[in-house]
């Protein structure tokens, strides 16, 4: 691990790692070498040829290239404490970066190389501008190579974070250069993931800048001219953005770099560019420097390049792969992934007001980053009071009253899409195909996977940048910053109201005093724009429920019920979804998006759903995108008389052409994906942010009305403290509903974006590609015909191959999964994503430790009497009936639900069957999970049934009891049966609570009268109140979600636990090979499996005898599962695949009866009906397939027999008296096999087989 040096600003100069640096011919500054080649300079950055000066009136002016700015001239200029804090903060970030694999590799790369020197026959020298100068302790002037200098923010803006190449050309052409990094660790941007907002981790953003510096150092900054250009047509409401270099997108990494990857692969490093690296390597190898330092420099370069020296020849292919590793393996996203840091989904994203924080140890550590997480709710993140931003005035005349309405909008909030110019003039031509052409196949593998798995990082694996020509040292510094021209127009006149007017109409004025005036919610946009006491809402019911109370509520209960009504109406309207099958690949339409954002309101009488169905996805676009066209030229084959006389080379040329054709299709697809991303998806992403803003405005307006009602409350004054709590909880409930709705909105928007790509853009190029295919086929046919005499018998094969692959009716399929992420997988597994997003607590076992597996690291105490045992999938928790067998979970805000906060609890539980020892507990309720003092909730057991109880602060109690009996629910639902049951309890505090077992609804009760079940008590997992001290329970995956799942989601949640192909035994645990089981039939529970020898047939016949039962009380009758006796058979399933110990669906195995051998079909020597009966035989294999023809959540399986014409399912004979025996013989039923899927499975159970292992939870 690289050693990070630690300094204080007042440490004395040592002339080695702490120096007084003279740089850019400026006054000396104190610099600290944190690792070799990287220096920290705790000063403001003021070394630039930028002629734009910071205005004196800093509070009112923002420069053209900025979105947000903070002006402060004094910071980091004279205060030693500020300088020391800056130095310590950067050091902390370096330690955090260095603690990751990627970060450590990055710092090693930077610290073990220098920009490529000037090379001649007898000399190797560094360029002067890539060095720093300082005085040694003894007064000598020292010149030393340097790679990176890290400064504080620039003089013009404290929010600056950027990397400047000291020579912009040499950063791209292979020579390489030193970099200045401008950085502020305390001012942090705010980003979004889904509907959540978070603050960037400064270690992640510093890593981003260091990667830029690495590219500059090696001279491999993206050399192409391609940029994402953003139009400046201000009359179209297009925002003003800098051009985004592909260098920026690739340095960030993530999904966006994958999208543009195929588009840039070809131009990234042309072969002649890489070949020159080999030439430079030879030049260094052949030089003969005189001075020791130069010899050492030469040897270090040779050591770094040796991995690419293959027997004296420079391996350009391997070197190019190495460059690609650096490009696609080292990026900010991969660093964030390794450190589990939240980062934005896309490089280009809406910027939100930044935050300020100190990086003290109680706020930020090297290991965890932000101790309390990155959410903007973290109180350590402060609002920046003196933040300024660039605005534009939008003016429009209303349609009804003809009033000119002007609003101020941040330019950052305007739309931005890629300019078509950035995609034009792309060369899709190809050189003539040769027999040895290097053709790459389309792949979806990750460069990062290759990078991390296949690269070993040590000094010999570094490589220096290589000059293309002998360099002439420039006389001045080149400033490489892009400063685009921006339209300075500050006011825009428009014909109609825009989305921004609608959003502004939903916003409460900053100066509005909600304690004195009521803010009315109205459904008229013009009424709102003309009256500051009104806000616009697209939600009619919500407006009615908010406005119906003028003022003067006189009772706390009435106030509470009014809050509930408002929340309920708002939530119901947010949950609106219109299912549709009229627009391809769209699951549903969110109908209020139109009226919220003024989309399509002039169409279909304001019906957004109908307008969307009629016009499609394009209705969402604020600006109609203009796409660059593609010009394709047919592939041609290089013809050479000598080569074309060789059959193998002719065939290679044809095959390479066909492979290149596939590559071309994928290249064109990738080009269209890049345009879609820059012109369509950016607009869709803006729409998502606009809806987030809209719902936020709605909540603010609703809360303002609540505060108004509180200030005008006519009841007792001592009620107001309680009412404040109600309002606080109501705001949480409103935000929860909005976040939930945003997930539906986001899905609708993302599906719309992908639909446009699949159904509009991709088809638009297919006809062009088919013409390309036809022209290419013509060239191939001519080439094959010309060389038919050489091909001989392969002529027909080659022609058939061309005809097949270039058939006009075929095309190369576009793989939607090739679009990196974009939530496609999330859309497919939306329930899983939603549950993960809402999971706030998950008690389980990991690495033999009981912990919170949700990622929230909830504090819990596990007492010594709690055991970890084998469970439903792996290890699970066992609670015993003793004082030390308990788990105490300290509650945090995430799991403290009150008033209006919905939640769901789900868990797996295995409770032993009631036996005689349990009689002393009959009629007694005892606790399993308790979070109740004077109020709260708990889960308990009574007479083998589960009890869910809620109690509010006024003592009102709601109970749900399963009320099942053993006899009618033993297999499926009864809790005390020793079988794993999945319990789900949903609590919708505005309506009801519901209890489910195994995904099926058992009971539901209204909880509308309950008023607050929150408390500060811990959640205690403990058997408390029972008399039987031998009792125990097994508990697994106890999860709490911060929303109430609906009925279909509960069913899906239960089914999600059965995605594996592993079959399960009678108890619900994995079925295992070579383990002893009793095998019982569902039709005759309690009927033991026996065998009998029939001498006249010479075989042992297995059969099931009559059911045997026993009583544990006068009202509970229980079937025997364990059977004793010399003729009772236990079985083992014998593995034929040797994969692992678990039995999976469709495994072929032997069912071995422990006494008499394998279960097989009788030999075909008796009557036809008897040939289908099963016998036991030591010498023959049964080759039975264990299958599951019903849903995966069943704890039984079917057994299929394969035997010539007697295929069937293992069943029991209808005639119990066959062979004069009192029982049911086993046979192969072809009828059941043919008809199983059409049968009433509640009646037809004879082919369902359980495997029962002996367990301490079931005693007989």
Curated annotation (Swiss-Prot):
Catalytic activity: Limited hydrolysis of proteins of the neuroexocytosis apparatus, synaptobrevins, SNAP25 or syntaxin. No detected action on small molecule substrates
Biotechnological and industrial applications of this entry: Identification of mosquitocidal P.bifermentans strains in regions where mosquito-borne diseases are endemic could help control mosquito populations. No mammalian toxicity was detected.
EC number: 3.4.24.69
Region (Translocation domain (TD)): 401-824
CDD domains, per database record: Toxin_R_bind_C_BoNTX_like
Disulfide bonds: 395-406
Residues the record lists as binding Zn(2+): 208, 212, 248
Active-site residues from the entry: 209
InterPro entries in alphabetical order: Bot/tetX_LC (IPR000395), Clostridium_toxin_transloc (IPR036248), ConA-like_dom_sf (IPR013320), Kunitz_inhibitor_STI-like_sf (IPR011065), Toxin_rcpt-bd_N (IPR012928), Toxin_trans (IPR012500)
Keyword Hydrolase on entry: yes
Cofactor(s), by name: Zn(2+)
Official protein name in the record: Paraclostridial mosquitocidal protein 1
Organism: Paraclostridium bifermentans (Clostridium bifermentans)
Lineage: Bacteria, Bacillati, Bacillota, Clostridia, Peptostreptococcales
Gene: pmp1
